[in-house]
């Protein structure tokens, strides 16, 4: 939620603070007609991770949190995520991921 709140503030978008029992269906925001899913990681070497079945948004954004501060590491289009993904082996659901080196700078969103 911290990454979503920071993204909303950065782009002047309203943040949905109500937890929905079924989740947000993979879309956190609509920006210029494009659906956005913000993924937040606290890992020292963060990756943008999603289950294949949950890849629905037009754009994915990777936020990294440390000490209650948020840094946006970049974004990627859905098709590029699908084309460039790797699979986390040995993790339930075998989620897909891309490393932050594959992401576009947040300033170009």
Give the positions of each predicted feature.
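Nucleic-acid endonuclease domains
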Residues: 1-32, 39-109
């Amino acid at each position: 939620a911290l990454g979503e709140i920071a993204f909303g503030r950065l782009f002047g978008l309203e943040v949905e603070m109500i937890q929905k029992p079924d989740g947000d269906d993979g879309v956190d925001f609509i920006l210029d007609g494009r659906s956005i899913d913000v993924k937040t990681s606290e890992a020292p070497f963060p990756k943008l991770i999603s289950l294949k079945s949950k890849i629905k948004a037009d754009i994915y954004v990777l936020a990294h949190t440390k000490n209650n501060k948020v840094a946006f590491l970049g974004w990627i289009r859905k098709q590029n995520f699908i084309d460039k993904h790797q699979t986390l082996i040995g993790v339930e659901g075998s989620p897909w991921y891309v490393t932050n080196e594959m992401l576009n700078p947040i300033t170009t969103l």
